[in-house]
C-alpha cells in the first residue's frame, strides 16, 4: 500500500475510533510514526484528507449499490424497491454498522458541512451509476417516463436520505411509494396504495 493510502486508512480508523473532531493531523502522524511533512506532502490540509476519507465511504456505498444491481431480478420492481430501501437504511443509517462513529460524527451540527459533502458525493456517484445501468436495463422492458434522469435520481437520493434522516421511523412502504411515484413506475395497485 502506498503512503497516501496508508494515511487515508489511518485517518479513517482514527475517525471511527475517536470521531472526527478528535482526529488531528498530529494524531494521524503519531499513530503512523511519520513526520507531519509527509502528511502535508500528500494533503495540503486536514480538510483535504477528510475529503479523501469521505471518498472511501462513498466508494463502499457504490460497491453495495453495484451488488444490489447485480442481484436485482429483471422486471421485479417490488423486489428492487424492497431491497434498495433496505440498502439505504443499512448503508447510511444502521447504527449497528461498522461505521457507527463516522455516522454519528456526520449527524452533528458541527459537521453539517461534512454531511453535505458526503451526501452530495453519494447522490452524484449513485445517480451516475443508476442512470448508466439500472435505468438502461429498465428502459429495455418499459418506457422510461422521466426526463433528466441523472437530475431526477440526484434529487430523489438527496430527498430520500434527507427525509429518512429527519424521519427515521418512516415505513419502508412509504419510502417505496415515494420512489415509485417519483420515477413513475407502474406498480400493482394493491401493493402501492399506502398513505403517507
Locate predicted features.
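Helix-turn-helix
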Residues: 6, 14-48, 52
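Amphipathic alpha-helical packing segments from all-alpha helical-bundle domains
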Residues: 66, 110-138, 147-151
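Hydrophobic alpha-helical connector segments
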Residues: 52, 66-94, 150-153, 172, ...
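Short, Lys/Arg-enriched anionic-surface-contact patches
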Residues: 2-3
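Amphipathic alpha-helical segments used for helix-helix packing
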Residues: 90-113, 162, 166
